[in-house]
Amino acid sequence: MTTHVTLEDALSNVDLLEELPLPDQQPCIEPPPSSIMYQANFDTNFEDRNAFVTGIARYIEQATVHSSMNEMLEEGHDYAVMLYTWRSCSRAIPQVKCNEQPNRVEIYEKTVEVLEPEVTKLMKFMYFQRKAIERFCSEVKRLCHAERRKDFVSEAYLLTLGKFINMFAVLDELKNMKCSVKNDHSAYKRAAQFLRKMADPQSIQESQNLSMFLANHNRITQCLHQQLEVIPGYEELLADIVNICVDYYENKMYLTPSEKHMLLKVMGFGLYLMDGNVSNIYKLDAKKRINLSKIDKFFKQLQVVPLFGDMQIELARYIKTSAHYEENKSKWTCTQSSISPQYNICEQMVQIRDDHIRFISELARYSNSEVVTGSGLDSQKSDEEYRELFDLALRGLQLLSKWSAHVMEVYSWKLVHPTDKFCNKDCPGTAEEYERATRYNYTSEEKFAFVEVIAMIKGLQVLMGRMESVFNQAIRNTIYAALQDFAQVTLREPLRQAVRKKKNVLISVLQAIRKTICDWEGGREPPNDPCLRGEKDPKGGFDIKVPRRAVGPSSTQLYMVRTMLESLIADKSGSKKTLRSSLDGPIVLAIEDFHKQSFFFTHLLNISEALQQCCDLSQLWFREFFLELTMGRRIQFPIEMSMPWILTDHILETKEPSMMEYVLYPLDLYNDSAYYALTKFKKQFLYDEIEAEVNLCFDQFVYKLADQIFAYYKAMAGSVLLDKRFRAECKNYGVIIPYPPSNRYETLLKQRHVQLLGRSIDLNRLITQRISAAMYKSLDQAISRFESEDLTSIVELEWLLEINRLTHRLLCKHMTLDSFDAMFREANHNVSAPYGRITLHVFWELNFDFLPNYCYNGSTNRFVRTAIPFTQEPQRDKPANVQPYYLYGSKPLNIAYSHIYSSYRNFVGPPHFKTICRLLGYQGIAVVMEELLKIVKSLLQGTILQYVKTLIEVMPKICRLPRHEYGSPGILEFFHHQLKDIIEYAELKTDVFQSLREVGNAILFCLLIEQALSQEEVCDLLHAAPFQNILPRVYIKEGERLEVRMKRLEAKYAPLHLVPLIERLGTPQQIAIAREGDLLTKERLCCGLSMFEVILTRIRSYLQDPIWRGPPPTNGVMHVDECVEFHRLWSAMQFVYCIPVGTNEFTAEQCFGDGLNWAGCSIIVLLGQQRRFDLFDFCYHLLKVQRQDGKDEIIKNVPLKKMADRIRKYQILNNEVFAILNKYMKSVETDSSTVEHVRCFQPPIHQSLATTC
């Protein structure tokens, strides 16, 4: 029976699929996320000790002591956390200002209510330290008893006592440091006394004891010292503890950084405790009981070690404060002020890199075979192969521990030795101590070294984490094999000898070891084993089959075996003769070697936890000690002083390509700190502070990274598009325009799930959002820059847009952005509006600046700004100051492009018109043309029409062309006299010419736009040709057929032919669009569409007023001598501007350019008066006569020859204008008038004949 599933359930199940993480090819440049699986903890803290009844009873009892001492150590750690993370409560509580304050009782009650739980903790802490000192001293007293002094004490037991010594040192230093603890207790005490809470004498005494305990520095140390000194021989036991620490430190018998630093602290504090009134460490050194020179060497190599959190301890301080230091000062070198090379991390980097590369190479070999090929867990390996993996795991953990310890040691040294304004010129004198210890205390090289080492640690942690299951298998197999081989095989020979020599104690220990650890093949020890009887093996040998399993020993089991083995080779045994002397030399060496190797078994059996501890750098964030030093002035330090952000920001600020892929590793320090705050400190408020800082830092990180990525690709686009010849020319002059250095942003842009504080962050999406905004801002800035400048800057605008387009294309390889056209339309405000900002500004510039202030030069085909502006400079908004990457990409590129485009600044010509065509498109051009026609209409039917009417009135009614016999001087004088009123008309050379210039510039703009548009369309057509099956005729050899070659070419380009392709594969809508597009592309040039014809036709419709054509001619044909038509007025105007000007005066060309002539000639052509103008023009008539007689006189202050030359220039210009206009107008007339209109006139009749008729 099928289960019914509703639609809602089905949809919700589908939605759940989105939450499944799918494996991708994201490069791994971040640390491993915290495992969601539980870490198995096999440490039983000796709870199963009673199960090992076969073991030596004394060591089982010792395990019981161990168990209780470990519990006390854990309790001590909890109190250390309490002290370290203590934040002052009393500062937050309102203070009672005077005894008369009405609410003082309420304040004191609240104070007691808030502080009482905290003071109770302090009271428990005081009791604990008393109990811990008593317990430690009782153990010391027991072990130092006269009858027990020669008894064997295990290394594990001595180390546990050493951990106690370390605990006392840490607790005392934390108590000394925390002033807020004392302040809170004082506040509570005041409030409690006021409220009479402590009435009984015992409470008062306990409170007084707590006050004294908190107030006295080094109280724990003093109490410990006093109680130890009364124990006879205590220094001997402490010497054993110090010696075991020296031995472990020298032989690197530690794994985690905390273990290493604990050994050093125990050495230092142990020496301090030993050196007193009863004992003298220098005498013990003389007796060779301890080795002070070796300890001095250790302390000189490592002067400062972490104490707890961000608290550090100078090891030499223990020596300096010891009782007999002054008289033995010369024996110590560690107390002298010198910097150990250990703290110069830059010098250590060569060795660290070498170790990293060597180990990674070896690990990769195993990783490829174990993890990648999947042969790890399934395949059974030999003991040697398991041993290799075991050793590899151990070496990896030791390397990680070494690097982590090195980072923490350098950090500790820096915290103890903050910089100042004399050591670092960048450090201000007002900088806080923590700021001097972190922000200004590292050079750039040191920061990079820190980042690199952290990246190595976290990167290797990832690789080893991937192989954890393989390592686990190998570790359990290897440890099992090592234990069983040793117990079942190696110990047979000493057991045989002990039985033969009847060494009962030795037999009991060896048998206890075998019974504790052996896992026999048949489930029980072979009863016929000759060694049990002290006999030799038979000649054929006694075969013992040792099984192989992936099972590790329990922590108690391992402890028992190691302790019993240690008792065999120890120098103390409780009797006159040691067990060691009963064993052969090779056996002793074998036991010592196994005992040393098995030290790391406990760590490796918990490899997951060990790996996490070896890579833990959480203390780089904690700053409770330095917060305490601010005495409440700081609640928390800003991110500029936080080490994780300092390292991250340094990579971002320097833009170092080799470090860019490491940028996520410093951020993982927040993960370490947050994990430590929750699991070790167990303080939610610390986690909240870390989370708040992460939120701020990550926002800053994404903001800075996105800006950098955008700037990088913008500079790359700007460099690619920069003219190569310009770059080469600059190089010749010694100016280098650099390409942006290659950076590794691609890896960062592939990060889809960055793990930070348990969140999975799509870094690519966040950067994409920022870059989309930056892209939009960049386009907006390009358009705003154009809007703040004149029309000449449109060429620069196009290149800015091209650079942005290339930037968009480069970025789209790594992220999903909106299409460039959509972004451009949004920035141009052209999404829903029919025209955008560019179109509006082009028209605005045409109207207010281009038409009234530019002069056209037909020779250069350019417009230039007029020498005398007749209108004010239009007011434009200034562009906003933005970063260089919002323009061309960088400062050098901005300067280079500014130089290139400065050559386009002083004119408007073909480059500008082509750019306008490309940017405005058909729709924008149509809008601009329409608006220009409105301007022309308003001028022709407004200002110009009024002036024409006025000027027609002042023209002579009749002005015949004089006969040639008058000569050119006479004709000039005649015209000058006839046109006197026109010449002297005040507004002719200003407002009239200015208005005509605007009309001419508008007409010229339309013409040049069409020419530029035609070129762009031809370019489009050529580009589209292969996709439209428009193929060029091919060259054929003699004897070849054209049809064959063409068919072959058509077959070659057939896959590119778009329309048949879409007709075969597309939807009906796509097919329709493809056909229409193909038709438009083919036909728009072929059918000879001309926009300029339409413009001229529209302008002709504006010339309907009778004043332009004058009244009908009296002769019924045309006006000959009458000055009533526009062409006669234009002749008069032409006569005026042909008159040569004085030396310091501007000519009409300089003031108005060719636009003036274009306006006049266009009106004449549109009115159909061109031929009449050519026949009856005053200037042309004067020129013809002057060419014949060649005279040069000055008539009315007008040089005749110069005037004739000017007339000739304008005649040539007029002819060019007429030719261009007629080319367009004739096609219009041909199209519109298919029937030719012919008017028939009667032939002329002579006067004599007319009278006779």
From Swiss-Prot:
Source superkingdom: Eukaryota
Keyword Manganese annotated: no
Expression sites by tissue: Expressed in hippocampus (at protein level).
Key word Cytoplasm present: yes
Any one of the GO CC terms: neuron projection
Coiled coil location: none
Any GO molecular function: small GTPase binding
Sites bearing N6-acetyllysine, chain numbering: K1037
GO biological process, one term: positive regulation of proteolysis
Keywords: Acetylation, Apoptosis, Cell adhesion, Cytoplasm, Nucleus, Synapse, Synaptosome
Subcellular location: Cytoplasm; Nucleus; Cytoplasm, Perinuclear region; Synapse, Synaptosome
Function text: Part of the WAVE1 complex that regulates actin filament reorganization via its interaction with the Arp2/3 complex. Involved in T-cell adhesion and p53-dependent induction of apoptosis. Does not bind RNA. As component of the WAVE1 complex, required for BDNF-NTRK2 endocytic trafficking and signaling from early endosomes.
Subunit: Component of the WAVE1 complex composed of ABI2, CYFIP1 or CYFIP2, BRK1, NCKAP1 and WASF1/WAVE1. Interacts with FMR1, FXR1 and FXR2. Interacts with FMR1; the interaction occurs in a RNA-dependent manner. Interacts with RAC1 (activated form) which causes the complex to dissociate, releasing activated WASF1. The complex can also be activated by NCK1. Interacts with SHANK3; the interaction mediates the association of SHANK3 with the WAVE1 complex. Interacts with TMEM108 (via N-terminus); the interaction associates TMEM108 with the WAVE1 complex.
Family recorded in the similarity comment: Belongs to the CYFIP family.
Protein name in the entry: Cytoplasmic FMR1-interacting protein 2
Species for this entry: Mus musculus (Mouse)
